[in-house]
A protein has these predicted regions:
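Conserved active-site helix of classical SDR/Rossmann-fold NAD(P)-dependent CH-OH oxidoreductases
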Residues: 35-36, 86-93, 123-126, 154-155
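NAD(P)H-binding glycine-rich loop region in Rossmannoid oxidoreductase-like domains
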Residues: 1-29
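C-terminal substrate-binding subdomain of Rossmann-fold SDR/epimerase-dehydratase oxidoreductases
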Residues: 129-218
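A conserved pocket-lining segment of Rossmann-fold NAD(P)-dependent short-chain dehydrogenase/reductase
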Residues: 19-20, 72-76, 101-114, 125-148, ...
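Active-site Tyr-X1-5-Lys
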Residues: 60-63, 76-104, 129-131
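Conserved catalytic-core motifs of eukaryotic protein kinase domains, centered on the activation segment
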Residues: 18-26, 60-67, 117-118, 140
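Conserved Rossmann-fold NAD(P)-dependent oxidoreductase catalytic core, especially the SDR/UDP-sugar
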Residues: 7-10, 36-80
Length: 218
């Protein structure tokens, strides 16, 4: 698929944290080995390459911390998923320096939008409500995510692909910080349900507290 194309944009990934905790091996195969194979293909054919990654490679921030992630924030992944994405980012940087590939990297906040996989937070809650199942919320629902619509994400990726500097990393966010309980209650109210009509469940291991993006570089 690589020969004859202007660029490769690598969106593909295993990306659900719960699944990575239950079975990390597919994440290693897809996110690390898959990236390696694409890098070798673009090295062979000299094609421009953009690598789509996640802000989760930076770990998390305290709920009361006013700071945001920047391109200079040290990597500190805290889950099997985020560690494989951090590894794939490092592969891109190494292949860029060693082989002179024309690459860029973007680390984006949490996406939402049409046709998103049902394993993700927003479509899972919507699907549960439609199916008559009470939504479930981890911990105290205090975990904060910086939400961005998929169209805004893709628009930013296009800008990086067409205007970005080779070897650079760009953070993509939308200043859309909300904690999980707020998002769930918004969904319940939008669907005509009682905003308290959900169940609390035990928090997952290593659940990141807060993500926040400083995307001023874009």
């Amino acid at each position: 698929l690589v020969p004859g194309h202007d660029a490769i944009v690598h969106y593909a990934a295993e990306s659900h944290n719960d699944n990575s905790i239950a079975d990390p091996e597919p994440f290693l195969r897809t996110n690390v080995e898959g990236t390696f194979r694409l890098l070798e293909a673009v090295r062979k054919y000299g094609v421009r390459y953009h690598h789509v990654s996640t802000d989760e490679v930076y770990g998390d921030l305290a709920l009361d911390d006013p700071a945001k992630f920047t391109e200079e924030t040290p990597y500190k992944p805290s889950s099997p998923y985020s560690s494989t994405k951090a590894s794939s980012d490092m592969l891109v940087r190494a292949w860029t320096r060693t082989y002179g590939l024309r690459t860029t990297i973007s680390n984006c906040s949490n996406n939402y939008g049409p046709y998103q996989h049902v394993e993700k937070f927003i479509p899972r809650q919507i699907t549960n409500i439609i199916d008559g199942v009470r939504p479930k919320l981890y911990g105290k629902g205090e975990n904060v995510r910086d939400w961005i619509h998929t169209e805004d994400h893709s628009s930013s990726v296009w800008d990086i692909l067409t205007k970005g500097r080779t070897g650079e990393t760009y953070l993509i966010g939308a200043n859309g910080e909300n904690n999980n309980i707020t998002v769930l209650r918004m969904i319940l109210e939008a669907m005509g349900r009682d905003p308290e009509d959900f169940d609390w469940v035990a928090d997952r291991p290593g659940h990141d507290r807060r993500y926040a993006i400083d995307s001023m570089k874009l």
